[in-house]
Each structure stands twice: as C-alpha cells, then as structure tokens.
Amino acid sequence: MRGVDDLQSIILTLVTFTPLAGALLLMFFPRRDRDIRVFALVISLLTFAMSLHLPVHFHRAQTGFQFEIDRQWVLTPNIHYHMGIDGISLWLVVLTTFLTPLCVLISWNSIHDRVKEFFILLLIMETALIGVFTSLDLCVFYFFWEATLIPMALLIGIFGHERKVYAAIKFFMYTMIASVFMLAAILWLYAHTGSFDFVVIREQIMSGALPKFPAAAQWLFLG
C-alpha cells in the first residue's frame, strides 16, 4: 500500500531527526526543570517507539540495505542524503533509542544545574549517533560522526566529575586527530571511485575495480 511504502521510505528520517527537533523545541522552554525532564523523556520514548517499526518490518531473508532513502543533496561533489540499515545497524539504532530514555530517567534526580542544556545536548547526541549508524553516504556519515563530538565533549566538560575539563579536552583532541585520518580515507575513496556512496564503493571493491584492502583502509583503521 502507498501509505506503508511512504512510511518505509521516511521512517529512518523520522527516527533520526525527532530527537533533534525535540532539542530545538527545548531551547524555547522556560526554565522549569520538571517540564524539561518530562518533555525530554516523551521525545526519547517517542523516538524509541518509532524505532520499533524497524525490527518489526525488517525482512531477514532479504540481502542488502532496507528502509533506504536516497536523495541528491549536493551536485558537486556528488553528495547524497542516502540512509539505510542492515541487520547490524538495525540493532545499533534500536539500542541507541532504548538507552536514551534510560539516560533521561537515570539523570532525573542527579542533574540539578543547567538541566535544559543537559537534555538538549543528550537529544542532539542521539540524533548524531543514529545518523552514524544509518548513513550510507560517507560525507553524511562523517558529518554525523563529527556531530557526536561536540555534545559529548560538552557533556563531559560541564556535567562530569573530577578533572572533567581535562577529560573533555583530551577526548576532543584524540577524536579530532583520529577524524583527520578518517577524512583522508574518505577523500581517497572519492578520488578513486567518484562517489561517496557506500553501496557504490562496495560494488566497485567486489567487482575488482578497487583492491579489497586499499591504502584508504589503513587510514580508516587509524581513524
């Protein structure tokens, strides 16, 4: 049916960006801590509920990626908003959406200062993590990967305990250095395939057009 097909094509977008939409709405909330906590919990539970659509409608006998959406984003270079999941990323997405409301509940009585900022960062990080697990375009993947860095570093630096600033700076620096190697690998793959699309790159490797263990793999490993 058309309605079901339409949902199949947008469900990953809904699951990915619902937490971000919630974070943006939280920015306009008055500083009433209880209301902020309740709203963050509702958004995280809604995201988890939507993510359950994925395992229920996932066809285990089918190979390749499912719930795919592929739209041209940037013409030059050739960047697509391409998202999809396989049997591994499926459960990583569900695990992320399951753990987020637990994080909200666990922090309910332990976070007393900057409550709004805490939950905004938590919801932004949820969107970034889901994006990492569902992106099939390496440029979009890299964007989401870097997007996890800022909220995570701020959560450590603001809401951590002893030596929290040192820990946040160390985390930020190590992740940024590693990301340079990852970016180098992604650019190498684009230079040799003309595409950032994971499916296209995989097909070229399987067909022998690219070596199975190119130099870029070493940079990805370091990243």
Set out the residue ranges of the language-model regions.
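Short glycine-rich loop/turn motifs that provide flexible caps or phosphate-binding loops at active sites
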Residues: 21-22, 86-88, 95, 156, ...
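Short hydrophobic "helix-edge" motifs at membrane interfaces and signal-peptide entry regions
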Residues: 8-10, 21, 75-78, 126-128, ...
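Transmembrane helix-loop-helix hairpins at membrane boundaries of multipass inner-membrane proteins
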Residues: 1-11, 26-120, 194-212
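Hydrophobic residues within membrane-embedded alpha-helical segments of Major Facilitator Superfamily
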Residues: 18, 22-25, 43, 47, ...
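Alpha-helical multi-pass transmembrane bundles of energy-transducing inner-membrane proteins
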Residues: 33-34, 117-124, 128-220
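Structural signature of hydrophobic alpha-helical transmembrane segments
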Residues: 6-18, 85-96, 138-151, 217-223
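Hydrophobic membrane-targeting signal helices
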Residues: 17, 21, 25, 54, ...
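Tryptophan-centered motif/residue detector
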Residues: 17, 71-75, 108, 133, ...
